[in-house]
């Protein structure tokens, strides 16, 4: 069993924000496979289905970014899942827009959603970091992450989310390298970045 969590903020005013790319990615997975309708549980929206015969729960915490760990921690405990069966998808300031990196464990790099998950769950889980770029100065970070994706961003955003969703089964099978290769190749082949 797996839990795939996308980080973001609830509410229509945040829907297209850079900070909500985790929600967008989980929505892309939801649309790519057969999942149950979204329901409310664990202070989150949650859905379940199967990817490669593995039971998977998708979760979008509705606690706002800084408290994401509360919802994810509740779900992990309820389903008795280990951190090795948790995948978190979120925005990363220190990666160029559209770049993707994956790692197990590590620090939070100042990301408040990750800080919350680390505090409530521990640190040894899979992280898919999607680059949103840095605005250049610390004073502009808040405005940048809560700003909407630009028209230029839309050119890489949809294909990237589609590639993540279509290849997530590789990650569930434990093939991180092939997952990264497939996602990177999709972006490269489309000359998006």
Curated annotation (Swiss-Prot):
Enzyme class: hydrolase
Record EC number: 3.1.1.29
Reactions the enzyme catalyzes: an N-acyl-L-alpha-aminoacyl-tRNA + H2O = an N-acyl-L-amino acid + a tRNA + H(+)
Record site: Stabilizes the basic form of H active site to accept a proton: 91
Pfam name, any one: Pept_tRNA_hydro
Keywords noted in UniProt: Cytoplasm, Hydrolase, RNA-binding, tRNA-binding
Active site residues according to the UniProt entry: 19
Molecular function (Gene Ontology), one example: tRNA binding
A GO BP annotation: rescue of stalled ribosome
Swiss-Prot/TrEMBL site (Discriminates between blocked and unblocked aminoacyl-tRNA) positions: 9
Record-listed tRNA binding positions: 14, 64, 66, 112
Superkingdom assignment: Bacteria
SUPFAM superfamilies: Peptidyl-tRNA hydrolase-like
Transmembrane segments: none
Reported function: Hydrolyzes ribosome-free peptidyl-tRNAs (with 1 or more amino acids incorporated), which drop off the ribosome during protein synthesis, or as a result of ribosome stalling. Catalyzes the release of premature peptidyl moieties from peptidyl-tRNA molecules trapped in stalled 50S ribosomal subunits, and thus maintains levels of free tRNAs and 50S ribosomes.
Family label: Belongs to the PTH family.
Subunit structure: Monomer.
Name used for this protein in its record: Peptidyl-tRNA hydrolase
Organism: Bartonella tribocorum (strain CIP 105476 / IBS 506)
Lineage, top ranks: Bacteria, Pseudomonadati, Pseudomonadota, Alphaproteobacteria, Hyphomicrobiales
Designated gene of the protein: pth
């Amino acid at each position: 069993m797996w839990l795939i969590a996308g980080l973001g903020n609830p509410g229509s005013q945040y829907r297209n924000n850079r900070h909500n790319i985790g929600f967008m990615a989980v929505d892309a997975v939801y649309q790519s496979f057969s999942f149950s309708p979204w329901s409310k549980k664990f202070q989150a929206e949650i859905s379940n289905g199967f990817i490669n015969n593995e039971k998977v729960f998708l979760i979008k915490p509705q606690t706002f970014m800084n408290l994401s760990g509360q919802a994810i921690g509740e779900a992990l405990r309820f389903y008795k899942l280990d951190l090795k069966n948790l995948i978190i998808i979120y925005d990363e300031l220190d990666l160029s827009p559209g770049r993707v990196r994956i790692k197990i464990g590590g620090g939070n790099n100042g990301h408040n959603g990750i800080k919350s998950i680390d505090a409530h769950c521990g640190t040894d889980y899979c992280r898919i970091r999607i680059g949103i770029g840095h605005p250049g100065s610390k004073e502009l970070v808040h405005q940048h992450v809560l700003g909407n994706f630009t028209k230029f961003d839309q050119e890489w955003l949809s294909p990237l989310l589609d590639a993540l969703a279509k290849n997530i089964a590789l990650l569930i099978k434990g093939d991180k390298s092939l997952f990264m290769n497939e996602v990177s190749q999709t972006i490269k082949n489309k000359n998006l970045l």
